[in-house]
């Protein structure tokens, strides 16, 4: 049934939205959850498969120990209780992307449960709605294997309905997943989209700090399902929910919530009933479309996985993992904000670039926070992007960057010379000191040489000299550039400017 959408502000004035978020996280293990196939993203289709992930007769699963460790660390970071005993179950359904006709998951015995994550929700852009902290209650975090990836060819929607044929890539089948499920998020009111976005962003920061996933939403290593229902008042029973699947960006999470609130309100206003269903999010249009009626747990006929023994984590090991957890990102952000004076946006940019650890290590090596941030988010970030690698993979470390920053601060290198020295280090020519010496990059400190270059340029540009004497001091910029050229860039521009203005009079 098609109905005209209700304006979002009208919808939240009339109804109380209740959210539930399910986030699927691909773990960055080297091999799959129950087999030894690699997990590299972007490999040729169906080249990272094996008898277990293809469900061939006689293939037996073996649990990936690293995946279990990552699952426990995630649970601990989300303030969850860790199960003293848990087990896997078979989730039975038929679909081409799961060749076994069941998914190995956890049903009634998850590895982690009853946690929470405090989320800082920022003020609205127009400043009319203040910032606040919302505690998201975590119902469970459970382990499961990912499915294969379907490609539906032909048709107008990219979905299986109307497609001429479908292709399946089983490289993803069996990759370790953690599904993190919230309890209903109540009391969010008109800020429901902001809370949803802030939660996924905060969760992504936690996962990144644990180094358990690359959390690249655009590659599907972090996928969000948005459950939403409306009710007349906060005291009313929960309404019928819809589930919007595989929302793959923070902005889309926010937009999907807004759209579904407006759609649910329109359905309820019309006197119809909301259908419990899964829906597809369309990034290009900002709309959701119906997928299928939502199955209940009993429809999957869960039963214990007979080929895997129960998991009984050693409690001493769990406590060791707890003690080794990194500082929570929100706490770290507040600490560094106080120590460094960075804005939340600047901090977020460093986190998203994977640079925060490198910046902190560079500061510890002696650089100022501003200089460390400038290098890692500027020149080095551009180089990493150009090479298609992570910042941490570059052949330069925090100590090198701190040394470059110190040389610039001391006036021994200009910014341009420091960039040239960096190129040498990245090219494997040696340490910063070795590259500076080999390339002769040190700034000329001899005023005699600088004065000679300045006088040569002044003599060649009498018209510019007259402009400066006539009050146009900005004309000195052209002369400074020529002097720098004479000095092959090995001079301090500020000192050259002083000498030019002294001699012009």
UniProtKB/Swiss-Prot annotation:
> What is this enzyme's EC?
6.3.5.-
The catalysed reaction is:
L-glutamyl-tRNA(Gln) + L-glutamine + ATP + H2O = L-glutaminyl-tRNA(Gln) + L-glutamate + ADP + phosphate + H(+); L-aspartyl-tRNA(Asn) + L-glutamine + ATP + H2O = L-asparaginyl-tRNA(Asn) + L-glutamate + ADP + phosphate + 2 H(+)
- State the Gene Ontology terms under molecular function: asparaginyl-tRNA synthase (glutamine-hydrolyzing) activity; ATP binding; glutaminyl-tRNA synthase (glutamine-hydrolyzing) activity
GO BP terms: glutaminyl-tRNAGln biosynthesis via transamidation; translation
Which EC main class describes this enzyme?
ligase
Q: Which domain of life is it from?
A: Bacteria
Question: One Pfam family this chain carries?
Answer: GatB_N
Q: Which Gene3D superfamilies match?
A: 1.10.10.410
The coiled-coil segments of this chain are none
Keyword list, A-Z: ATP-binding, Ligase, Nucleotide-binding, Protein biosynthesis
What does this chain do? Allows the formation of correctly charged Asn-tRNA(Asn) or Gln-tRNA(Gln) through the transamidation of misacylated Asp-tRNA(Asn) or Glu-tRNA(Gln) in organisms which lack either or both of asparaginyl-tRNA or glutaminyl-tRNA synthetases. The reaction takes place in the presence of glutamine and ATP through an activated phospho-Asp-tRNA(Asn) or phospho-Glu-tRNA(Gln).
Family per record: Belongs to the GatB/GatE family. GatB subfamily.
Q: How does it assemble?
A: Heterotrimer of A, B and C subunits.
Question: What is the protein named?
Answer: Aspartyl/glutamyl-tRNA(Asn/Gln) amidotransferase subunit B
Q: What gene is this protein translated from?
A: gatB
């Amino acid at each position: 049934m098609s109905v005209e959408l209700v304006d979002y502000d009208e919808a939240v004035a009339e109804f109380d939205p209740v959210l539930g978020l399910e986030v699927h996280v691909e773990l960055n293990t080297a091999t799959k959850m129950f087999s030894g196939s690699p997990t590299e993203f972007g490999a040729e289709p169906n080249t990272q498969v094996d008898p277990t992930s293809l469900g061939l007769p006689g293939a037996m699963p073996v649990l990936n120990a690293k995946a279990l460790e990552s699952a426990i660390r995630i649970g601990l970071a989300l303030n969850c209780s860790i199960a003293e005993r848990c087990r896997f179950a078979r989730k039975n359904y038929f679909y081409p992307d799961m060749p076994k006709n069941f998914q190995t998951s956890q049903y009634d015995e998850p590895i982690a449960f009853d946690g929470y994550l405090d989320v800082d929700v920022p003020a609205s852009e127009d400043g009319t709605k203040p910032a606040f902290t919302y505690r998201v209650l975590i119902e469970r975090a459970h382990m499961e294997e990912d499915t294969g990836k379907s490609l539906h060819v032909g048709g107008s929607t990219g979905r299986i309905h109307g497609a001429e044929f479908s292709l399946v890539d089983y490289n993803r089948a069996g990759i370790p997943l953690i599904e993190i499920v919230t309890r209903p998020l109540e009391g969010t009111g008109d800020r429901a989209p902001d809370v949803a976005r802030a939660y996924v962003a905060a969760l992504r920061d936690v996962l990144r700090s644990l180094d358990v996933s690359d959390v690249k939403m655009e590659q599907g290593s972090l996928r969000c399902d948005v459950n939403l229902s409306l009710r007349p008042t906060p005291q009313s029973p929960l309404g019928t929910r819809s589930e919007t699947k595989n929302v793959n960006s923070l902005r889309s999470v926010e937009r999907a919530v807004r759209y579904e609130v407006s759609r649910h309100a329109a359905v309820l206003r019309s006197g119809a009933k909301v259908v419990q269903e899964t829906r597809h999010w369309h990034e290009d249009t900002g709309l959701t479309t119906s997928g299928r009626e939502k199955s209940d747990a009993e429809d999957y006929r869960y039963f214990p996985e007979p080929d895997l023994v129960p998991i009984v984590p050693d409690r001493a090991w769990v406590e060791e993992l707890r003690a080794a957890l990194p500082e929570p990102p929100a706490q770290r952000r507040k600490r560094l904000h106080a120590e460094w004076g960075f804005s939340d946006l600047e901090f977020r940019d460093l986190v998203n670039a994977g640079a925060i650890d490198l910046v902190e290590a560079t500061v510890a090596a002696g650089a100022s926070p501003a200089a460390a941030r400038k290098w890692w988010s500027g020149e080095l970030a551009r180089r990493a992007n150009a090479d298609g690698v992570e910042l941490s993979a570059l052949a330069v470390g925090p100590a090198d960057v701190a040394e470059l920053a110190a040389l610039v601060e001391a006036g021994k290198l200009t910014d341009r010379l420091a960039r040239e020295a960096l190129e040498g280090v990245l090219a494997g020519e040696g340490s910063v000191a070795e590259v500076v010496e080999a390339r002769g990059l040190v700034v000329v400190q001899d005023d005699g040489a600088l004065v000679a270059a300045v006088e040569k340029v002044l003599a060649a540009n009498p018209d510019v000299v007259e402009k400066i004497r006539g009050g146009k001091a900005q004309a000195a910029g052209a002369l400074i550039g020529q002097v720098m050229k004479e000095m092959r860039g090995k001079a301090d521009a500020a000192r050259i400017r002083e000498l030019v203005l002294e001699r012009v009079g």
